[in-house]
Amino acid sequence: MRFRYRKWRRPRRLFRSRRRRGYARRRWRRRAWGRRRRVRRYRRRRGGTKRQYISSIMQWNPQHRHLCYIKGITWLCAARADRMSWPGIKQIAATDSTRYWSTILVGGCGVLTLSMDWFFFENLRWRNRWSHSNVGYDLARYMGTHLYFPPLADIWYIVWTDTEFVDQPKKVMSYTHPWILLMTKKHKVIKPRKWNGKGKKIFLKPPAVFNSAWYTSDKWCGAGLGRIYFSFLNPFKQIMHTNQTEQSFPFAIELGNTDYDKPPNNSYDFKDTNEVKKVWNTAGKKYYYRADWDTGDGNAIMLPNTLSPTTPASWLLLEWDAPYWLWFWGKTYQDFVSSHTPEGNPYYGQIYVKWWPITNPYDQGPHTYPEDKEWCLMMLDPQPNFMTCNSIAAALKIAAFGPCVYAPQDTQTSQIPINIPMYYLSKWQWGGSTQGTSTHIDNPCNPRPKSIQIADPATAPRDVIHPWDVDASGTISTAKLKQLMEGLGYREPKPKPGPPETLIPPGAPTPELDYYSSETESDDFDTGDSEEEEEDHQDPRWVRESLDKLTRRLRGERRQRQQLGKGLLALLKEKK
């Protein structure tokens, strides 16, 4: 049945509608079948389980506290075209005999570890500012750091942060590879301004091991607060790079002994460049490498330790089931040469690897069995006076031609060098049992760049006087006095050689008594004269005189200590 919609409006009703009746009144009456049960107004406990009550965690806080914001700018790296796979930063931890050090290298990847040492080191280089001085505060609490990575003009880069780590930075350089960072959770890709890219913000929470607790500032030194993994990212040329016609490229030559279990046997005269060049140009002698075929299964490296490496003991064997483009990432020439330099051998920089005998650049495989890999010598086109570093150059080329890496020919001259800046804001809180330093007022007639006096966090607790360092009379303890003297550059002299320490014989003068006996006598500081003592020491009058002399002597020693403490405090104020 077909329905039709009305095209005309129904006429309005003219008659008056019926008046609406009112609501019926509700009549209440008592139930006839008994009284209602009393309502339970308390919460019933769940059977079998005890309810968990959430309460606030109370922790101790020092009496005097002050917030401090550390705001600054730094650089992650400064790279050029041929060093995109080299490390771009170097950090050396402080020891008992050396201070902390951090510097920027010419490279395109690296790991930056944030710490209290790094923040203070950056302040010494005029790269950050502290909103409040830490002078007078020996406790510190960390509350996190905000990071900002601005976009570059036309270069991509990738960043990843971590607060829970245990390995050393040199052992985690493989995590800075752009292909690995792309598969890491919570990574940040900073697109260039050419592609309408915007900067990325990251907040580094305090590590879980610290739990927002108070520690002395020297304990924060050397403790890693977070790590920043960074590298440049090439999203457009992942496999084939500029001027490449095939995915593969020659990187090694065939050896005489290709046994899988034995070390390679050098059957070529590498001192003769022309002979090696003939082998290089011979068909079937060059091996080709493809990054997309390298799974890492069965890969191995050998480095010579002696002048004539003919036995297994004369080689250093390294095995790691990782592709070579990841193995050689973050390496420099010194990483291959520094610890393997046979004295007197100009051709020590030889690297032997295991790879499939791929002699055709148009080979399409399959190559899936690691047992088919053979030893080969890494080498590029042989050139005179370049044989020492030829194998190392081949290894660095493999790293530079890896996935998502900027090869030397992928960048233009106008883009080099490339710098990656980083802005940060770190929040701290200083604390202590005594009030910290007051605001310093500079001379307005001789203006200087405004700054806040900052003490080295590693030595700040040493220069702070706590209530427990002073006794009831105001005298500084011996241990604290020694620390204050060390802050002024004083070092305790070495004791003179003498007889072993024994009990002082009766009647022998002590150095302390001799010092005070040389002072002039006064009314309230009497050291006593060498009078003849009475034979009868049981006389009460003699006992009272001896006690009176001893009391005056102790009073004088206390006064000398107080004067010495005031003098040291004055010297500390002048030094600050």
Swiss-Prot record:
Positions with biased composition (Pro residues): 496-509
Subcellular location: Virion
Keywords for the protein's UniProt record, in alphabetical order: Capsid protein, T=1 icosahedral capsid protein, Virion
Bias type Acidic residues, positions: 520-537
Transmembrane as UniProt keyword: no
Biased composition (Basic and acidic residues): 538-551
GO cellular component: T=1 icosahedral viral capsid
Chain intervals for the UniProt region annotation (Disordered): 489-576
Positions with biased composition (Low complexity): 562-576
Top-level taxon: Viruses
UniProt-listed Pfam families: TT_ORF1 (PF02956)
Similarity annotation: Belongs to the anelloviridae capsid protein family.
Function as written in the Swiss-Prot or TrEMBL entry: Self-assembles to form an icosahedral capsid with a T=1 symmetry, about 30 nm in diameter, and consisting of 60 capsid proteins. The capsid encapsulates the genomic DNA. Capsid protein is involved in attachment and entry into the host cell.
Protein name: Capsid protein
Native source species: Torque teno canis virus (isolate Cf-TTV10)
